[in-house]
Each structure stands twice: as structure tokens, then as C-alpha cells.
Amino acid sequence: MLTGKQKRFLRSKAHHLTPIFQVGKGGVNDNMIKQIAEALEARELIKVSVLQNCEEDKNDVAEALVKGSRSQLVQTIGNTIVLYKESKENKQIELP
């Protein structure tokens, strides 16, 4: 579980990132969760954009992504979700 200080630190790191995944009309599926889990292992911190044509609520999408990829939700702002998962092999971010 992330503390408030750690979330603030990760939000500042994520500010300059661009979303690398988009959740659209199809919603969240197993293939997308697998790809997000692989991206989290490589990058540790990613942004996911929820498109307007997505039929699911953005909070439900965030919850599904967190459960499926076993990551932690840093922030949901607008239609953008920020996820963090500590990498096992190539750790880049040192939390305060």
C-alpha cells in the first residue's frame, strides 16, 4: 500500500509521461491486462487513457486493471489512470 508521500512522489514522476495504453469500446480484456503487466515490469509507472467511447466507468476500469495486473493505483485524473508496480528485475524508481 502506498503512503500519501509516495503517491505524491509518483504523481510528480508520472506528470511527464504520455499514456501508452488506451481503453476503448471493447473495455478491459485479458490480453490488455497481460500487456499492461509486462509494461509495468519494464517501466514500473505507466499511464492508461480511457477513451470516451468506453462503455465502462473509468473507476471500474481502474479497479479491473489494478486487480488484473496486481499493481497499485496512484491516481485517476480526468480520463487518465496512473498505475505503479515495483519491478522485480529492473528497478528504476526509489520510493521515499
UniProtKB/Swiss-Prot annotation:
<dbReference type="InterPro" id="IPR051925">
    <property type="entry name" value="RNA-binding_domain"/>
</dbReference>
<protein>
    <recommendedName>
        <fullName>Probable RNA-binding protein YqeI</fullName>
    </recommendedName>
</protein>
<dbReference type="GO" id="GO:0003723">
    <property type="term" value="F:RNA binding"/>
</dbReference>
<dbReference type="InterPro" id="IPR017924">
    <property type="entry name" value="RNA-binding_YhbY"/>
</dbReference>
<dbReference type="Pfam" id="PF01985">
    <property type="entry name" value="CRS1_YhbY"/>
</dbReference>
<dbReference type="InterPro" id="IPR035920">
    <property type="entry name" value="YhbY-like_sf"/>
</dbReference>
<feature type="domain" description="CRM">
    <location>
        <begin position="1"/>
        <end position="96"/>
    </location>
</feature>
<dbReference type="InterPro" id="IPR001890">
    <property type="entry name" value="RNA-binding_CRM"/>
</dbReference>
<keyword id="KW-0694">RNA-binding</keyword>
